[in-house]
Each structure stands twice: as C-alpha cells, then as structure tokens.
Amino acid sequence: MKRVSKPNFFHTLSRWFSLQFSLLAICLCCLIPSEVKAADNWKAGLAKTVITPETGVWLAGYGSKRTPDGKLHDIWMKALALKDNTGQRAVLITSDFQGVPKSMSDRVFAQTKNKYGLARKQIMFTFSHNHCGPRLGDDLYDYYPTTPQQDQLVAEYTDRMVDKTVEMIGQALANLSPARLQMGTGHTTFAVNRRNNREADIPNLLRSGKALVGPVDHSVPVMTVTRADGTLDAVLFGYACHPTTLSFTKVCGDYPGFAQVELEKNHPGVTAMFVNTCGGDQNPLPRRKVELCEKYGHMLAIAVEEVLKKPLEPISPGLKTAFEYVELPYLKVVTRADLETDTKSGSAIKKRWAARLLKKLDQGETFPTAYPYPIHAWRLGTEMLMIGMGAETVVDYSLRFKREFGPGTWVCGYADDMISYIPSKRVWLEGGYEGGSNLYEYGRPAYRWGPDTEDLISASVHKLVKQVDLKAD
C-alpha cells in the first residue's frame, strides 16, 4: 500500500500567499482603470504662441485710431487637439483676438486641410473679442480712419498670424498623448445685460443692492485635461461677457487675459484657455479701470478654481464633429440710392462704408442677399456637447440651447468669423444696437438681418446635434 504524504506546511503557506496576491492584483485592476482607461480612450495635445504685435498695428474694436504704446501682458493664441480611441480628431483654437474675419480663417482652414488632413468640421477658431488686441485683415474695415500704411501693417501682421496658427495646430497634433478629460461648472456674476441696464446707473444699483435686469448667463463651464499620472495639463473655461473693460492703448487680454494669467500662475505648466460663450449683449460693468479688469479676471479665475476643488465628471470616450453654413438673409440689400444718401451721413463709419460699397457697384459687383453663417456641433463622449457659432451671438442663444440640450452643453459664440451681432428673435423685435440697423458697421451690404435669423440658426443647430449623437452609432 502506497503511503500518502501530508501536505507540507510551508508549501500550503506559499500557495495561500500566491492566492492572496492574485486576488489583490485583480482588485487593483478593478480600482485603477478610470485613469488607465481614460489614457487609452483620449489623447490630447497642446500648443500656444504669443500674438502680441511687434509693429504699430492699431488695436481693434473701437472706431478710432489706437496705436499700442506698451502692454500689460502678452496676448496669446492656443490650441487643444483631441483624438479619441477610434482615431477621430478635432482642434479647438482659442485666442485673444478681437475678431477673426472669414478672409483669414478660410486661409487657416485650407492650409490645415492640406497639411494635416483636418476637415472643416474638425477645427473651430474662436476669439475672445478682446478690444485691447490688434486688428486683423478686413475685419471691421470701415470702423477705422485707416491709411495705406496702416493697411499694409495689418496685412503683414495677418499673414504672420495665419502662418503661426497653422504651425501651432501642427504642434498640438504632434503633441497628442494619453489624457483624461473631465468637466464641471462654476459661477461668477460681473457680466451685466447692457441692453437692460444703463451703464451710468450700475454703480448706484450695485451699492443699493437692487437687482439688475435682463437675461444673463453667469455660468462658467470648465473642462480639464489631465495626464495619465494625474498631472493637470490644461483648463478650458468660458464666460458670456464682452472683454471691453478697457479702451486704452495698452495691449492686454482684458479680463479673460488676466484670468488666464492667474490660473497659469497658480498652476505652473498648465495651459489656460478661454472661450466667449455668447456675450454679445453682455458687458463687464462698471468698467474702464485696470483695477476693475484685474478684479473681473480674478473673479473668473476664482470661479474656475472652485470647480477644480470639487469632484469633476469624467468625459467618456467618443468624438464626433459636424459643421455647416446656414444662409442668413438680410432684411433688405442696400441700393445705390441708399448708399448715395449715406455718403452724407453724420456717422464717419457709415460714410466710409457707403463710399466703399459705391465703388463696388461702379465696378459691376452685385451684393449677396444672405451671408454664410458658420455653425459647429462637437460631441465629446455622452457627457459634453459643444456648439460653436460665428460672431457676436447674444446670450439668448446660450440660454436656449443649454435648456434644449441639457447639462454638459457649451454654447460658444465668436467662432470662425467676426460677421456682426447675431440677434435672437427677442432682440431683433426689440431693435437697438444688437438687433437693429447696424450691419453697415461690419461692412455688410445691408442694414439689418431678416426676422427669421434665430429660427434658421436653431434648425441648423438641431440638425447638427443629431448628426453627432454617439448613441445613434
């Protein structure tokens, strides 16, 4: 009869430890995939470049000659490239420009497609609408009492900015590396609806504690880019307000510039990026002092910091982008008789505009009856929807689309093309500066948009949002 040996104590102990180690490894694998999976599912790349003018290019945004005589800080253009786990790519550009005209952005889009294979729907070129930044191309051309020498400086600067933008996009794409995307929302209150509150009354109203009136959007959407090791690499944030605190001759980024400077100082190595979320009828009030500009920048930075202190919502994998132009009709295209009358206007801007358009008619040109308006929809995971809209959209658009599409919706104005104010139906019916007969200031061959502007934009946005629905795939 064969003798059966008893199990060795040390052998049993060794097997027990081996089992425990295996169980521990399994548990750890279950605990850490949030960062590991995020690193596998998203890649992000960053790049930035200084855009502070080195020549006498006038500052943009007000109808006068403003030659810069120094700076409070440099102004920037920044790029965030994204790539999901299926290879889909997109690039968001933020900048401290007042306005990027179509004549400039189209050059960027064409070169980007040729060099990097990015389609029009994959790139969004936003500008903060900062009024202490340089002129670009033919943006607001009739606004300024310009000269041939100034035109040459602007053309040369614009050419350099096209080259810098394309190069920066390439750098961001080259820097794509594993990342985790998260988001949250903050709040700050310095934006005031300028249509419903007289600027001169604001200080007394604030001191008395009386409520200001009119629609506002005081939310501060925030998205972070974190690397696989937990290092914060970028903070993208938005706010709906004109960067018009200052109107002097020093280069700076106004309140968004101060907010970005503060965030990057607080978080060394981090890239802070700002988008203007439909601030067409919103002003930082009171204003016109550097101290107030610094204060508003600090308030915005604090709102972002408060978000960073809280648990953020992870953005799941998946990237889908859509884009189209929607033709926005003018109410009435100007005639030769209209322009001849306007050459006698008391407005210097209108006189310059009328004279320029009369030359076009003399050369045999006919004016279009509508303008191609750019609209984007980007879906990041199932959590975040970014709607990009051209030019100076009023706050009604942000409030409407966030209500219709729910939490996680960003509505960015000032994208791709500085066309004019884009009124909602409410603002169009009320008239006034943002909704009335002021398209001539932007060089358009008309005084006013048609009454169905909001309806046309809304229909396009809803169509594009359906196209980027990840759940439909």
PLM regions and their residue ranges:
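Conserved beta-alpha junction segments in alpha/beta enzyme cores
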Residues: 39-126, 130-271, 277-278, 288-298, ...
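Bacterial N-terminal signal peptides
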Residues: 18-32
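Charged, flexible cofactor/metal-binding loops and thiol motifs
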Residues: 301
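Catalytic histidine-centered segment of alpha/beta-hydrolase-like enzymes
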Residues: 282
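N-terminal secretory signal peptides that target proteins for export/translocation
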Residues: 1-17
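Sec/Tat signal peptide C-region and signal peptidase I cleavage site
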Residues: 32-38
